[in-house]
Design a protein with these regions (language model features):
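N-terminal Rossmann NAD(P)H-binding glycine-rich loop of SDR-like oxidoreductase domains
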Residues: 11-39
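Active-site Tyr-X1-5-Lys
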Residues: 151-182
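SDR active-site strand-loop-helix element
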Residues: 22, 47, 83-87, 122-128, ...
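Hydrophobic/aromatic anchor residues within beta-strands of the central parallel beta-sheet
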Residues: 61, 99, 122, 178-181
Length: 186
């Protein structure tokens, strides 16, 4: 029986924490994967539709669609300790329907997998842009501010909906520690 403690690389000690990163082949995904990879407490698995050339040798990469059975199997067949979801498609060649299906449908499936397979921690990357730039906004917005970007910027609709899905998940799956990151650029 596992104590839940991570296994050091090459050791027979306690189990390493499995962190699944979506969007691992993207710029930010690579940075996060490499940072966590250097910590011997973590085992990194990535889900991305794109290949991940140059990945560290002990990082497992699944080149799959987030909505697929193969993606679900990553959660079903192995104890996942955390999900870092950064797998949002920004392909200008994709149709609105394709983007919606991938982004919103994929996020919905991932949250479903986390609830079904008892993933204790979920981090969803959003953006401060979901608040929408409005002249009546105060200088500093709180997390309680409404997400109004989709009203003026249709391209933001998927990201706003993903944020809403994660917020709803936060309240529905109270036993899962859920974090929504809304970084802002300077």
């Amino acid at each position: 029986m596992s104590s839940g403690e991570p296994v050091p690389r090459g050791g027979d000690g306690p189990r390493r924490k499995k962190v699944v990163i979506t969007g691992i082949a993207g710029r930010l995904g690579r940075v996060v994967a490499r940072a966590l990879h250097h910590d011997p407490r973590f085992l990194i698995e990535g889900l991305d539709r794109r290949p991940f050339p140059g990945k560290p040798k002990d990082v497992i990469h699944h080149q799959v669609d987030l909505r697929s059975k193969k993606a679900r199997d990553v959660f079903r067949t192995g104890e996942v300790d955390a999900l870092i979801h950064m797998g949002v498609m920004h392909d200008p060649r994709a149709t609105t329907a394709e983007l919606y299906s991938w982004n919103v449908g994929g996020t919905s499936k991932l949250l479903e997998y986390c609830a079904t397979y008892n993933v204790p921690k979920v981090v969803v990357l959003s953006s401060a842009n979901v608040y929408g730039p409005r002249p009546e906004n105060p200088q500093f917005l709180t997390e309680e501010a409404p997400l109004l970007a989709a009203q003026r910027f249709p391209a933001m609709r998927d990201l706003v909906e993903i944020d809403h899905l994660a917020s709803t998940f936060f309240w529905k799956a109270r036993d899962i520690e859920t974090v929504i990151l809304r970084p802002v650029s300077r």
